[in-house]
A protein has these predicted regions:
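Extracytoplasmic and endomembrane cell-envelope/extracellular-matrix remodeling and assembly machinery
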Residues: 1-165
Length: 165
């Protein structure tokens, strides 16, 4: 009997995603990359954090283990278009840049690295900044800087003084 792995036959794929991702990582460890990709890419999800996670993981497997940057771009684009927080936007843009760089699409890669580097307070934003501006220091804009009075009051708190030791 063959089990159909489509959204019409899956019950609550959002609840199953965590288990699927754990199994996929185990398959990667066992070097069963194609099976891991099938498990993550046929997730049956259409929205939400599980959808974003599934699309990113599918793109990562496609790029890192299947050596298929075109397939990865498809997944990273879906990821990028369905997230909203800076940490996720920078992550999606970075991986789109990396996929395009591998394809030799330097202009497209730089476009995505620049997009990711707009979020300098994130890991991928910093990686992207280093890719396109290797000798230029990080400069945070005024919206990212902490108000001096707020910082001063924060460091006056007893618990902060204890932890700061």
């Amino acid at each position: 009997m063959k089990i159909k792995n489509t959204k019409d036959y899956m019950v609550r794929p959002d609840k199953w995603w965590k288990e699927r991702s754990i199994i996929a990582r185990s398959l990667i460890y066992k070097k069963k990359f194609t099976t891991a990709y099938k498990l993550t890419s046929k997730h049956g999800l259409t929205e939400g954090p599980e959808f974003a996670d599934a699309e990113w993981m599918s793109g990562w497997i496609a790029l890192s283990f299947l050596n298929d940057p075109l397939l990865a771009i498809d997944h990273f684009t879906k990821f990028y278009e369905n997230v909203g927080y800076p940490i996720s936007l920078s992550r999606g843009a970075y991986w789109l840049g990396r996929s395009n760089e591998i394809l030799g699409n330097d202009n497209e890669a730089n476009k995505w690295y620049k997009e990711s580097s707009k979020f300098l307070t994130t890991y991928y934003g910093q990686l992207s900044h280093l890719k396109i501006f290797p000798n230029k220091p990080f400069v945070l804009n005024e919206l990212m800087e902490v108000d001096k009075d707020l910082a001063e009051n924060f460091y006056k708190k007893d618990l902060v003084k204890i932890v700061y030791l």
